[in-house]
A protein has these predicted regions:
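Conserved GNAT acetyl-CoA-binding A-motif
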Residues: 118-129
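Conserved short alpha-helix immediately C-terminal to the canonical SAM/SAH-binding motif I
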Residues: 110, 134-137
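Short secondary-structure capping/turn micro-motifs that flank functional sites
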Residues: 44-45, 134-135, 157-158
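Glycine-rich acyl-CoA binding loop
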Residues: 103-108
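Conserved catalytic-core motifs of GNAT/GCN5-like acyltransferases
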Residues: 129-131, 142, 147-162
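Acetyl-CoA-dependent GNAT
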Residues: 4-11, 15-21, 26-100, 111-113, ...
Protein backbone atom coordinates (compact mmCIF):
# COMPACT_ATOMS: atom_id res chain seq x y z
CA UNK A 1 0.00 0.00 0.00
CA UNK A 2 1.39 3.36 -1.05
CA UNK A 3 1.56 5.95 1.72
CA UNK A 4 1.28 9.41 0.17
CA UNK A 5 2.85 11.15 3.15
CA UNK A 6 6.02 9.07 2.61
CA UNK A 7 6.51 10.34 -0.94
CA UNK A 8 8.45 13.46 0.02
CA UNK A 9 10.84 14.48 2.75
CA UNK A 10 10.70 18.17 1.79
CA UNK A 11 7.19 18.91 0.53
CA UNK A 12 3.58 18.35 1.47
CA UNK A 13 1.99 15.78 -0.83
CA UNK A 14 -1.70 15.22 -1.40
CA UNK A 15 -4.09 14.01 -4.07
CA UNK A 16 -5.17 16.85 -6.30
CA UNK A 17 -8.90 17.48 -6.64
CA UNK A 18 -11.11 19.47 -8.96
CA UNK A 19 -10.63 22.50 -6.71
CA UNK A 20 -6.91 22.45 -7.63
CA UNK A 21 -7.45 22.70 -11.39
CA UNK A 22 -6.50 26.39 -11.67
CA UNK A 23 -3.22 25.88 -9.80
CA UNK A 24 -2.45 22.79 -11.89
CA UNK A 25 -3.24 24.72 -15.08
CA UNK A 26 -0.86 27.53 -14.06
CA UNK A 27 1.89 25.00 -13.42
CA UNK A 28 1.54 23.25 -16.79
CA UNK A 29 1.30 26.61 -18.58
CA UNK A 30 4.74 27.46 -17.16
CA UNK A 31 6.27 24.64 -19.28
CA UNK A 32 5.55 25.36 -22.97
CA UNK A 33 8.51 23.23 -24.12
CA UNK A 34 6.81 20.08 -22.85
CA UNK A 35 3.77 20.66 -25.07
CA UNK A 36 5.92 21.45 -28.11
CA UNK A 37 6.95 17.76 -27.99
CA UNK A 38 3.81 16.31 -26.43
CA UNK A 39 0.75 18.01 -27.93
CA UNK A 40 -1.91 19.15 -27.44
CA UNK A 41 -1.51 22.05 -25.02
CA UNK A 42 -3.22 21.31 -21.70
CA UNK A 43 -6.54 22.89 -20.80
CA UNK A 44 -8.41 22.99 -17.52
CA UNK A 45 -10.76 20.37 -18.97
CA UNK A 46 -7.89 18.04 -20.00
CA UNK A 47 -6.40 18.32 -16.50
CA UNK A 48 -9.75 17.34 -14.97
CA UNK A 49 -9.89 14.36 -17.35
CA UNK A 50 -6.30 13.36 -16.49
CA UNK A 51 -7.28 13.28 -12.81
CA UNK A 52 -9.61 10.36 -13.47
CA UNK A 53 -8.30 8.46 -16.50
CA UNK A 54 -6.81 5.02 -15.85
CA UNK A 55 -5.53 2.24 -18.13
CA UNK A 56 -7.70 -0.77 -18.94
CA UNK A 57 -8.01 -3.19 -16.02
CA UNK A 58 -7.03 -0.51 -13.48
CA UNK A 59 -9.28 1.47 -11.15
CA UNK A 60 -9.12 4.87 -9.49
CA UNK A 61 -7.93 3.02 -6.37
CA UNK A 62 -4.65 2.42 -8.25
CA UNK A 63 -4.27 6.05 -9.38
CA UNK A 64 -2.51 8.83 -7.51
CA UNK A 65 -2.80 12.25 -9.17
CA UNK A 66 -0.61 14.12 -6.71
CA UNK A 67 0.46 17.63 -5.97
CA UNK A 68 3.70 18.52 -4.21
CA UNK A 69 3.43 21.75 -2.25
CA UNK A 70 5.97 24.12 -0.73
CA UNK A 71 3.69 25.72 1.84
CA UNK A 72 0.71 26.67 -0.36
CA UNK A 73 2.58 26.81 -3.70
CA UNK A 74 2.06 23.86 -6.04
CA UNK A 75 5.56 23.05 -7.29
CA UNK A 76 5.06 19.66 -8.97
CA UNK A 77 2.40 17.31 -10.32
CA UNK A 78 2.76 13.54 -10.50
CA UNK A 79 0.32 11.10 -12.12
CA UNK A 80 1.11 7.63 -10.78
CA UNK A 81 -0.56 4.27 -11.47
CA UNK A 82 0.35 1.46 -9.08
CA UNK A 83 0.54 -2.11 -10.37
CA UNK A 84 0.88 -1.05 -14.00
CA UNK A 85 1.91 -2.25 -16.53
CA UNK A 86 2.40 -5.31 -14.31
CA UNK A 87 1.97 -6.15 -10.64
CA UNK A 88 5.61 -5.34 -9.80
CA UNK A 89 5.65 -1.92 -11.49
CA UNK A 90 4.41 1.60 -10.99
CA UNK A 91 3.80 3.84 -14.01
CA UNK A 92 4.45 7.57 -14.02
CA UNK A 93 2.06 8.94 -16.61
CA UNK A 94 3.00 12.56 -16.00
CA UNK A 95 5.55 14.45 -13.92
CA UNK A 96 6.12 18.17 -14.14
CA UNK A 97 7.83 20.74 -11.94
CA UNK A 98 6.81 24.39 -12.06
CA UNK A 99 9.23 26.26 -14.34
CA UNK A 100 10.23 28.68 -11.56
CA UNK A 101 11.30 25.71 -9.41
CA UNK A 102 13.37 23.94 -12.09
CA UNK A 103 17.16 23.79 -12.05
CA UNK A 104 17.29 23.68 -8.25
CA UNK A 105 17.28 19.91 -7.68
CA UNK A 106 13.62 19.87 -6.67
CA UNK A 107 12.52 17.47 -9.41
CA UNK A 108 15.38 15.09 -8.63
CA UNK A 109 14.57 15.22 -4.91
CA UNK A 110 10.95 14.35 -5.65
CA UNK A 111 11.87 11.49 -8.01
CA UNK A 112 14.26 10.06 -5.40
CA UNK A 113 11.65 10.31 -2.64
CA UNK A 114 8.86 8.76 -4.71
CA UNK A 115 11.22 5.98 -5.79
CA UNK A 116 11.86 5.20 -2.13
CA UNK A 117 8.13 5.31 -1.31
CA UNK A 118 7.23 3.04 -4.22
CA UNK A 119 9.94 0.57 -3.20
CA UNK A 120 8.70 0.53 0.41
CA UNK A 121 5.22 -0.22 -0.96
CA UNK A 122 6.65 -3.43 -2.46
CA UNK A 123 7.17 -2.51 -6.11
CA UNK A 124 10.33 -3.41 -8.03
CA UNK A 125 10.41 -0.86 -10.84
CA UNK A 126 9.06 2.41 -12.14
CA UNK A 127 8.23 2.81 -15.81
CA UNK A 128 7.44 5.95 -17.76
CA UNK A 129 7.81 7.47 -21.21
CA UNK A 130 8.95 10.80 -22.59
CA UNK A 131 8.29 12.42 -25.95
CA UNK A 132 11.07 11.52 -28.38
CA UNK A 133 13.22 14.55 -29.12
CA UNK A 134 12.58 16.26 -25.78
CA UNK A 135 16.21 16.38 -24.68
CA UNK A 136 15.38 18.22 -21.44
CA UNK A 137 13.16 15.33 -20.30
CA UNK A 138 15.63 12.72 -21.53
CA UNK A 139 18.57 14.28 -19.63
CA UNK A 140 16.52 14.66 -16.45
CA UNK A 141 15.36 11.03 -16.51
CA UNK A 142 18.82 9.61 -17.30
CA UNK A 143 20.30 11.71 -14.49
CA UNK A 144 17.73 10.23 -12.11
CA UNK A 145 18.49 6.58 -12.83
CA UNK A 146 16.03 5.74 -15.61
CA UNK A 147 17.26 3.71 -18.56
CA UNK A 148 15.75 3.24 -22.00
CA UNK A 149 14.21 -0.20 -22.34
CA UNK A 150 14.39 -0.22 -26.14
CA UNK A 151 10.73 0.48 -26.83
CA UNK A 152 9.47 3.43 -28.81
CA UNK A 153 5.72 3.74 -29.20
CA UNK A 154 3.89 5.88 -31.75
CA UNK A 155 0.98 7.79 -30.24
CA UNK A 156 -1.17 10.36 -32.06
CA UNK A 157 1.09 13.30 -32.94
CA UNK A 158 4.44 12.03 -31.62
CA UNK A 159 6.50 9.05 -30.46
CA UNK A 160 7.35 8.17 -26.87
CA UNK A 161 10.50 6.49 -25.57
CA UNK A 162 9.82 4.06 -22.71
CA UNK A 163 12.21 4.03 -19.74
CA UNK A 164 12.44 2.16 -16.46
CA UNK A 165 14.15 2.45 -13.12
CA UNK A 166 14.75 -0.68 -11.08
CA UNK A 167 14.18 -0.15 -7.36
Amino acid sequence: MLKIKNLSTNYQVRKLTTSDVNRAFELVQSNPTYFAYCPPQATRHSILEDMKVVPANKSLDDKYYLGFFDDTKLIAILDLIMGYPDDESAWIGFFMVDATSQGKGIGSDIINDISDGIKVAGFKRIELAYAKGNSQSERFLLKNGFIKDGREVAVPGYTVVVMEKKL
